[in-house]
Amino acid sequence: MNIDILFLNQELKASDDFINDLSLFEEYCKTHSFEGKANQIIAMPASYSRKNNLTYLVGLGEIEDSQELYELGIKVGSKIKEDVEIDFLNAENNIVPIIDGILYAQYKFNDYKSEDESAINNITFNQTDTTENEIKQSSIFWVRDQINTPLSLIHI
């Protein structure tokens, strides 16, 4: 599944480059109280998008700090429930912390669950090299698994 993440500030600038009908878009934003404030996230139907993909509208507000971008990425990542390919639209900020947040939000401790229920989502970022992010994700997930494994089961 392809999804787009459209970053917007409070002026909702650049939305006309990615939206089919601006008047419908503005009505949709008003109906869902989306104003582009920091940490606001809503899903916009694919029919509103020029690329016909499900699009998450992500409000940046005045966010510029890497930690705030990371936390925003966690919020976006928590909404992803399946394998996806992601395109970032209107991304003017440093997206590395956002990518980290999206990837780290996918963590699941799978040791005591069946494979069908517990597979970690495969997320691909189009137009972005995420090799370093994926290496960090793998390391962090390994550490989290070690922390969650009872000491009696760890083979030293």
Name the predicted role of every residue range.
Residues 1-154:
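Short amphipathic alpha-helical segment within the helicase RecA-like ATPase core
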